[in-house]
Amino acid sequence: MLKAKILFVGPCESGKTVLANFLTESSDITEYSPTQGVRILEFENPHVTSNNKGTGCEFELWDCGGDAKFESCWPALMKDAHGVVIVFNADIPSHRKEMEMWYSCFVQQPSLQDTQCMLIAHHKPGSGDDKGSLSLSPPLNKLKLVHSNLEDDPEEIRMEFIKYLKSIINSMSESRDREEMSIMT
């Protein structure tokens, strides 16, 4: 059984914990409380399998605190990560400015592929859902960008996240197959 480690990173108050709870079907937190360090959620998704035989997959979703005071812990969090989801509040201009820093630290420095990264522009309830006006500069404009609004269309983000998990598992399976073939030859 494959086990994938996915990091949820991004600025403070971007909605990482709310999204993580929703996507892993964990309990809801109604009152805001900043994540201290990291919170690890383990889950399985019946829609994601590692091969045609339907072998299940396990996931660890690491909900990482967005405060800069945890920056010294980031290298340890990144160890053995298979994917990174950068969550930001699309309604806060400073979050957009921080995106390149999160991308550099969590995707470029550990040499992950862009396909292993997904951006989520999270819209908090009542904030409106302006999907059209978000333009990102290179290299962020090459990444998969998904808008989430858990109030208006919660299933859209769930389906996009399942697609993302499938791509991570496919990449892991291909890598494992290549490794097995190199051992046999």
From Swiss-Prot:
GO terms for molecular function: GTP binding; GTPase activity. This is Intraflagellar transport protein 22 homolog. One of its GO terms (cellular component) is endomembrane system. It is found in: Cell projection, Cilium. Component of the IFT complex B, at least composed of IFT20, IFT22, IFT25, IFT27, IFT46, IFT52, TRAF3IP1/IFT54, IFT57, IFT74, IFT80, IFT81, and IFT88. Interacts with IFT88. Interacts with CFAP61. The modification Phosphoserine is found at S137. Belongs to the small GTPase superfamily. Rab family. InterPro entries: P-loop_NTPase (IPR027417). Small GTPase-like component of the intraflagellar transport (IFT) complex B. GTP binds at residues 10-17, 63-67, 123-126. It comes from Homo sapiens. PANTHER family: DRAB5-RELATED. It holds the Pfam family Roc. One of its GO terms (biological process) is intracellular protein transport. Keywords: Cell projection, Cilium, GTP-binding, Nucleotide-binding, Phosphoprotein.
